[in-house]
């Protein structure tokens, strides 16, 4: 077995010459490293080259603060609903991704996988982006501490992204009123019935209302997360992340971006 050293990122350099990943191989290919080896994020080989842009190797104190991405998971959660968006944000620079649940006790997913938690509702860092995956969501719709926490997050979060039946939690928190939304195809009618003030759409990969973004089922969570990346960091970064993940199903135009009059677009980094 070959042992490969993972290079350490450079916090600041006096010259522009350093070691980088091959251009276009991942979203980390512009992070500078002091020596050869492999990228600690994506394991691509590092090559020595000169960069024309300085700010990516500026001291950490000068770099843009990472956005907190809280992935709420619960017993019976659909694995791909949370694993897909988690991978998107973790594979893109500028995001701090962590899991949160009602407590710190391990949960069992819909596919019988045991998942460990980073935080509970009581000690979770305030999220800039909150992801609400689906699965067996029904038992949690009446959980008052959870619904109250989602409402509090909505007061300060930049984006709340629901995947699949996770839209039910948004509805229970009153966050779908007056909006267009989508969800898992088998959940469209129940969600519409429970949220008469919302318009639940079929055959739509994701719906962006500004702060509130909903997606269809399972795989569509990846599309929704990539859309959030494009919205916050630009289309080129999202495309690069999709390429790194070898996710060739993403078609940005399959989603609906609602024109929210009077609501400014999110600022890109």
Regions found by a protein language model. Give the residues of each.
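Short functional micro-motifs and their immediate structural scaffolds
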Residues: 32, 46-47
């Amino acid at each position: 077995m070959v042992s490969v050293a993972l290079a350490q990122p450079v916090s600041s350099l006096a010259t522009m010459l350093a070691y980088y990943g091959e251009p276009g191989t991942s979203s980390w290919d512009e992070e500078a490293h002091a020596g050869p080896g492999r990228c600690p994020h994506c394991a691509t080989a590092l090559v020595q080259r000169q960069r024309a842009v300085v700010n990516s190797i500026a001291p950490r104190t000068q770099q843009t603060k990472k956005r907190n991405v809280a992935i709420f998971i619960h017993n019976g959660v659909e694995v791909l609903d949370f694993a897909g968006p988690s991978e998107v944000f973790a594979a893109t620079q500028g995001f701090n991704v962590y899991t949160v649940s009602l407590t710190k006790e391990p949960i069992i997913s819909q596919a019988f996988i045991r998942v460990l938690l980073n935080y509970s509702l009581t000690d979770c860092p305030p999220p800039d982006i909150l992801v609400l995956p689906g699965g067996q969501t029904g038992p949690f719709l009446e959980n008052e501490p959870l619904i109250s926490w989602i409402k509090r997050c909505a007061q300060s979060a930049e984006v709340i992204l629901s995947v699949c039946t996770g839209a039910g939690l948004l509805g229970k928190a009153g966050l779908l009123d007056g909006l267009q939304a989508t969800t898992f195809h088998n959940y469209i009618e129940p969600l519409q019935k429970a949220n008469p003030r919302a318009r639940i759409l079929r055959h739509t990969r994701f719906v962006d209302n500004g702060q509130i973004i909903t997606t269809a089922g399972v795989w569509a969570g990846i599309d929704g997360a990539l859309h959030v990346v494009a919205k916050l960091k630009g289309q080129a970064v999202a495309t690069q992340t999709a390429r790194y993940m070898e996710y060739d199903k993403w078609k940005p135009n399959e989603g609906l971006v609602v024109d929210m009059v009077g609501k400014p677009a999110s600022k890109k980094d």
